[in-house]
Amino acid sequence: AFVYSLSPVIVYLLAYPFTFYIKYPNLRPTIYLVKIKYAKDLLGLGLQFFIIQIGCLILFATANVMISQMFGPDQVTIYNLSYKYFSVLTMAFSIVISPLWSAITEAYVRKDFKWIQMVMKRMMSIWLVSIIVGVFMLLFSGIVYRIWVGSEIAIPFSLSIVVLIYVSLNAWTGMFASFVNGVGKLRIQLYCTIFSSLFFLPVAIIMGYLLGGGGVGIGMSIALVPYAILLPLQYKKLLSKSLRGVWNK
C-alpha cells in the first residue's frame, strides 16, 4: 500500500520540473498571475462540484456497507458479482463519454448548439445500443455466472434485473451530467444531489428490508430518478434557449 501510494507522488515530483521549467515554462503557475476578481466565481463553482462529489460518494459507495450490515458479507459477494458483470457496460460507456465534457465546454463557448445537439443524439443512440447489449447480457447471465464462479454461488435473476436497471440509469444520467458540467450550469444537479443524498439511505434501507439485497439496488436506482428527469430537461431548455432562473445557474 505504501509503494502504491508513493508511486504517483514520485512521478509528479519528477515530471513537474521537466514540464514547467523545461518544456512548457510559459504554463508554470505563479502567484503574480493570480487575479482575485475571478475567485468568487471559481470558488463558487468549485464548491458546487465538491458537494456533488460528496453526494455521489454517499449514493454510490455505501451500497456494500448497507448490504453487509443488513444481510451479511455473503450478500455483498452476490451483489458485487452481479454488479461487476454489468459494470462492463458502465466502463465501455464511460470511455465513450469521457471526451464529452471538454468538447461540450468548447462548443458552448462558441455557441455551436447544432454540434452539441448532434453529439448528444449520437450519445443517446450509443446508450440505446448499450441497453440492447445489456438485455442480451441479462438473458445469458445465468450461464456466465456458472462459468465464472461455478454453481456454489447462486445469483438471483431478479438481482441481475435490478443491477441492469441501475447501470442503465447511471449511464443515462452520466451522459447528461457531462453536458451540464461542460456548460457549467450545476445548480439543478446540486439540488438533485442534495435531495437524493437525504432520501437515499431511508429508501434503500426500507427497500432492502422488504426485498433483500436487491432492494438496496432499487433504492440506488430511485435516487437517480431526479437526475434522469431534470438533467435532460435542462439540456432541452438550453437547446431552445429558454434557460431561466435556477436552470441557468
Question: Could you describe each region identified by the protein language model?
Answer:
Residues 1-23, 199, 213-237:
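Hydrophobic alpha-helical transmembrane segments
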Residues 5-12, 57, 84-87, 122, ...:
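Residue-level recognition of pore/gate-forming positions within transmembrane alpha-helices
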Residues 15-60, 103, 111-114, 238-249:
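Interhelical loop/hinge segments that connect adjacent transmembrane helices in multipass membrane
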Residues 39-43, 112-128, 135-140, 157-160:
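Interfacial transmembrane-helix starts/ends
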Residues 48, 63-65, 77-93:
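Alpha-helical transmembrane segments of polytopic membrane transporters and translocases
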Residues 73-75, 113-114, 139-168:
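Interfacial segments at transmembrane-helix termini and the short loops linking adjacent helices
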Residues 87-110, 179-182:
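Helix-loop junctions and terminal segments of transmembrane helices
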Residues 165-195:
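Membrane-interface junctions at transmembrane-helix termini in multi-pass inner-membrane proteins
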